[in-house]
Amino acid sequence: MKINNFIYIFLAAYLATFFRLTLNNNFFISIIGSFLVGFFVSKRLSYSNEKILFSGFFSCFTSFSGFIYFLYKILNQGDWIKFIIFFNLIIILNLLTMIFGFWISRKIT
């Protein structure tokens, strides 16, 4: 991988972090990120563009640790029912949103 690609990945990660801090809502960020991942997966990007977008932007924007921390806070309150509901809801909604993004991308191209 060329040095330029590393710079682009860094810039994409920086931009994603800025958006994540600006939005400041893990659930909303997760849904938007899943939709966009689904949308861009169908685009068949070049290897370097794929790395920039998925490794740089989306890995910082949709940070899995934000999702885990949210679930940890619920679990720490001892509310197992709420934990199970949110865990399943987040997984299912994100998967469906990604599929929807993929479908939309295919329909408009």
UniProtKB/Swiss-Prot annotation:
Protein topology in the membrane: Multi-pass membrane protein
Cellular compartments annotated: Cell inner membrane
Provide GO CC annotations from the record. plasma membrane
Instruction: Provide the catalytic activity annotation.
Output: fluoride(in) = fluoride(out)
A single Gene Ontology biological process assigned to it is: monoatomic ion transmembrane transport
Q: What does this protein do?
A: Fluoride-specific ion channel. Important for reducing fluoride concentration in the cell, thus reducing its toxicity.
Q: Keywords, A to Z? A: Cell inner membrane, Cell membrane, Ion channel, Ion transport, Membrane, Transmembrane, Transmembrane helix, Transport
Membership in a protein family? Belongs to the fluoride channel Fluc/FEX (TC 1.A.43) family.
User: Which named protein is this?
Assistant: Fluoride-specific ion channel FluC
Mark the transmembrane ranges: 21-41, 52-72, 84-104
